[in-house]
Design a protein with these regions (language model features):
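Glycine-centric low-complexity/flexibility signal
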Residues: 1-7, 30, 39-185
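Extracellular beta-strand-rich solenoid/capping regions of secreted or surface-exposed proteins
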Residues: 2-19, 25-38
Length: 185
């Protein structure tokens, strides 16, 4: 197992109330657990955006995928021979965007092979679920214009002794990174 599978960043509160003007941007290596001894009410924003893949327009070498963070897996290496994204559902064919929830984007195809997105892997019926973020998208494969895969979205757990309430304006964003765009630049 990786460090992100063994450790969780824990934030513990007596009672948590995030107003509409509050945005919390999480960064770091580990998945995040927000715990409350009473209630959790979120009217603001919780943001855990993963790193995008990169792109290259000249031959030779390659590109690392979007860096793993917040429990999400790294994107695949892009180059002459693209690599799959990391994680349980990592993109298998070159060039994909990373996953978040059940979504991911196919990679760009402009003189290189486009690829599969990573997929999310989770079981909502298990209250003792492992904190596993999204899988990385695969890296692009081509001779000149290639992009690496985006990193998978992070993992977040909200748990309280009382209620967890999401207000009408609440936003929880755990997007996977975009795959590197071979047409940019």
């Amino acid at each position: 197992p990786t460090d992100a599978e063994e450790y969780v960043a824990i934030f513990s509160f007596e009672d948590l109330n995030l107003g509409t003007a509050v945005t919390v941007n999480f960064t770091g290596k580990y998945p995040v657990a927000v715990l409350s001894k009473a209630d959790i009410r979120i009217d603001g924003k919780l943001v855990m955006t993963a790193a995008d893949g990169d792109m290259k327009t000249s031959p030779g070498g390659g590109l690392d995928g979007g860096a793993a963070a917040l429990g999400g897996a790294a994107g695949g290496y892009g180059g002459a021979i693209g690599k799959p994204g990391d994680g349980l559902g990592g993109g298998k064919i070159s060039g994909g965007g990373a996953s978040h929830a059940t979504l991911g984007a196919n990679g760009n195809n402009n003189g290189s092979n486009s690829g599969d997105p990573g997929v999310a892997v989770y079981n909502l019926s298990d209250s003792n679920i492992d904190m596993i973020g999204g899988s990385g998208g695969a890296g692009g494969q081509g001779r000149y214009r290639v992009g690496s895969g985006g990193a998978g979205g992070g993992a977040l757990q909200l748990r309280s002794v009382g209620a967890v309430v999401l207000g009408q304006k609440a936003l929880i964003s755990m997007d996977g990174g975009r795959g590197g765009n071979a047409t940019a630049g």
